[in-house]
Design a protein with these regions (language model features):
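A compositional/biophysical signature of low hydrophobicity enriched in polar/charged and small residues
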Residues: 1-135
């Protein structure tokens, strides 16, 4: 899987605007449309480009609070880790979940409309879970 400077520039342009046309991309890369399309297709087939997404404006959607919360589990056995990750996937407030090393097991990126909604989520969901020892 070799990525040359043209691929890197193409990827940068797609990260800025995933809706950019192949024609506009080709112009910016100083190549014709066919090789540009082939490069995009190859990068998708290799899994380098996994998907194209829309980046949403949280505030315009009324989701103004972002919190990074650290979590310790009651036990860190494989089954507990799987159960915790499955539980977290069911909550749209949690945008990202990362495994940590050190004193915390996970860090969560939580987005809510306001502080009260965040507090309710912590109290009624996270703190209520038998899987979580400490927040």
């Amino acid at each position: 899987m070799i990525i040359d400077s043209t691929d890197k520039k193409l990827l940068g342009l797609l990260q800025e605007d995933a809706n950019i046309s192949t024609s506009a991309l080709a112009d910016k890369l100083h190549i014709s449309q066919s090789p540009c399309w082939r490069r995009i297709n190859r990068l998708e087939e290799q899994g380098i480009i996994q998907k194209r997404v829309a980046v949403l404006d949280r505030e315009a959607l009324g989701m103004s609070v972002v919190v990074f919360a650290t979590v310790n589990l009651t036990q860190t056995g494989r089954q507990n880790l799987i159960e915790f990750e499955q539980m977290i996937k069911g909550h749209p407030e949690v945008l990202e979940c990362y495994t940590m090393t050190g004193i915390w097991d996970y860090v969560l990126k939580i987005v809510t409309r306001d502080v009260r909604h965040y507090e309710d989520f912590v109290r009624n969901t996270l703190s209520a879970s038998d899987l979580i020892r400490e927040l």
